[in-house]
Amino acid sequence: MMIAFSTGSLHTYGLARVAHLAAAAGFDGLELMVDDRWDTRDAAHLRAVVESAGIPIVSVHAQARPGNRGWEEDEVARLHRAVTLAHAVGARTVVAHPPLRYRWVSLRHPPFITLAMVTPFRQRSPYRRWLLAELESYQAREAITIAIESMPRHRFGPWLADLFEMNEIRDLRRFPAITLDTTHVATWGVDLLETYEVLAHCVAHVHLSNYDRRQHRLPQDGSLALGPFLAALRRRGYEGAIVVELQPDALEAGDEGRVRGRLAETVAFCRAHFIADPHRRGIDGQAAWMKDSASLT
């Protein structure tokens, strides 16, 4: 088990700065959030960044939104490319979203403006069919874990809307591996611990953050009882990564001292509730990564 930090938590910072902050705070690894910045998909640059910071990339979050330049529009092709990138940087897990229920439209006005929005028009994407028919065999061939993420629901007045297909508990149970996102589960209006007990057999990856009507809050600050959740992971022998995934404002991005302090507090919270011997686990995890990374060069 590793406590990792999503680079998307400080997406307004450069990758090198994020990597060094995470390493200094005591995180064991990084989850790379692929976005519209070229640096998030350049394997050689990424290897140089993490080697300099002394922290591994343990997972890659596939590009989730169409319309980003230099990245495929097709959802299956985007996932394949994320797997290729994961192999290149030594990551063992790729996080992918389930299919969007509605069609996505991107509008560009060169050179800088890109607008993206979900339309009210339903779609039945080839990606959904691929997940049902080919995901398991593809994952086995690639020798990598592809963990489909539990996504949020959105409230419109009295209605709770799900913009994603295959995002019900009964659907997620069918995947060989999932990413359980705690703040997203909070938007469903269900009990987190009960949900985990139902899905535990397929939870291979965790996105950890709290909820206070805003998503992706600090684990130690919100309405979710994440201490008992971490203890439940430990009791069940969970061996995957626990990735802290936040919004920049939760860390008070822009204030270096506050960012460093909140990151350190978050690592301490996670270790206190999960790891009996935090120093040993962190050293063992990083040593294993350093050995694997040497084989990539």
What label would you give each PLM region?
Residues M1-R92, F121-S125, R173-A177, R260, ...:
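N-terminal pre-domain/capping segments
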Residues G8-L15, L32-H45, R65-E75, R101-S106, ...:
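Acidic-and-aromatic substrate-binding clefts and catalytic sites of carbohydrate-active enzymes
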Residues A16, S52, R69-A177, D292, ...:
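Active-site acidic/histidine proton-transfer and metal-coordination neighborhood
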Residues F27, A88-A91, A143, V203, ...:
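A structural motif
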Residues G29-L30, V60, R124, L132-S223:
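Acidic/histidine-rich catalytic cores of soluble enzymes
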Residues A43-A48, E72-H80, R128-L132, A161-M166, ...:
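Charged helix-capping and loop-helix junction motifs
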Residues L218-I242:
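P-loop/Walker A phosphate-binding loop and immediately adjacent motor/lid segment at beta-alpha junctions
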Residues V243-D249:
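Short acidic/histidine-rich active-site segments
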